[in-house]
Amino acid sequence: MRSTKVIHIVGCHAEGEVGDVIVGGVAPPPGKTVWEQSRFIASDETLRNFVLNEPRGGVFRHVNLLVPPKDPRAQMGFIIMEPADTPPMSGSNSICVSTVLLDSGIIPMQEPVTRMVLEAPGGLIEVEAECRNGKAERISVRNVPSFADRLNASLEVEGLGTITVDTAYGGDSFVIVDAASIGMKIEPGQARELAEIGVKITKAANEQLGFRHPEKDWNHISFCQITEPVTRDGDILTGVNTVAIRPAKLDRSPTGTGCSARMAVLHAKGQMKVGERFIGKSVLGTEFHCRLDKTLELGGKPAISPIISGRAWVTGTSQLMLDPSDPFPSGYRLSDTWPNMPE
């Protein structure tokens, strides 16, 4: 068996969404900050293509690269690679990374609770892991500051007409739309149509509304979050959502950054108060338990500090290799599984 490279991966999923973790075989990319390192990964694309493209990956997969932290307060840094983006932050991926770090012993586990600080490209995140019998059973993450951007904006979408949307940031950027307003219901049997409509809405939102982060070089809307109405039981709000990820797939988890963005919008509209909780439910019925912990400012904008809580499970280990005679060293994409590819 010969190979010019060997990349060691621990497989993981958080509430259904795959977030594998590279634990060896890749040198840290250049950059003075984790954000700069993530921009190198995004522009270079060599690693992204190798681990995400077929035959080694697929559109279903997210992969995280562990890197030494740049901030002395953090125990570990990580860079998130999604099918179409290398984002500032991801809730499900941060839960996967935390679980792999503890379950594999890379960071020593302390039962019943392990606390650590991780450095995502978008900033530091505080992690609290509930641990028992050598397993990180639940991960709570204090997400990066999240904020509402545009509220009740009108958006023209081909085939849908004029719809009303909100835009917000929860560690990544979202256009948020009510499912009923576009004639949809969030259920597994409508996954393909939800994904395709969501990507179409994202494209229209980028063209007509745009987005600009006040501090990071993040100037586009990444995702469409399709929601069903929130219900309230005391100080607990519950809402079903699904997030369409380019090129056209649905997040299997409730999307931690999406829940954070949705809480920011609910707070901006006066529908959620500090200290209240939000249960986000995915298309699979899995849940993230969230809390609006406090308010703050980000670059002069009112923002919230959300906490996301969910579970993740290690699914296996693997080694990705490259035989020097392999005709597809960067892999490949076909439109049967990578929709909306340019012709």
UniProtKB/Swiss-Prot annotation:
- Identify the species of origin: Brucella anthropi (strain ATCC 49188 / DSM 6882 / CCUG 24695 / JCM 21032 / LMG 3331 / NBRC 15819 / NCTC 12168 / Alc 37) (Ochrobactrum anthropi)
Record key words, sorted: Isomerase
**The organism's taxonomic lineage, starting at the top:** Bacteria, Pseudomonadati, Pseudomonadota, Alphaproteobacteria, Hyphomicrobiales
Q: What is its EC number?
A: 5.1.1.8
> Where's the active site on this chain?
S90
What is the catalytic activity of this protein? trans-4-hydroxy-L-proline = cis-4-hydroxy-D-proline
This entry's Gene Ontology molecular function terms read:
4-hydroxyproline epimerase activity; trans-L-3-hydroxyproline dehydratase activity
Binding positions (substrate) = G91, S92, D251, G256, T257
Q: PANTHER family recorded for this chain?
A: BIFUNCTIONAL TRANS-3-HYDROXY-L-PROLINE DEHYDRATASE_2-EPIMERASE, TRANS-3-HYDROXY-L-PROLINE DEHYDRATASE
Pfam families from the entry?
Answer: Pro_racemase (PF05544)
**What name appears for this protein in its UniProt entry?**
4-hydroxyproline 2-epimerase 1
Enzyme kind, highest EC tier: isomerase
Sum up the protein's function in the record's words. Answer: Catalyzes the epimerization of trans-4-hydroxy-L-proline (t4LHyp) to cis-4-hydroxy-D-proline (c4DHyp) in vitro, albeit with low efficiency. The physiological substrate may be different. Displays no proline racemase activity.
Q: What family does this chain come from, according to its entry?
A: Belongs to the proline racemase family.
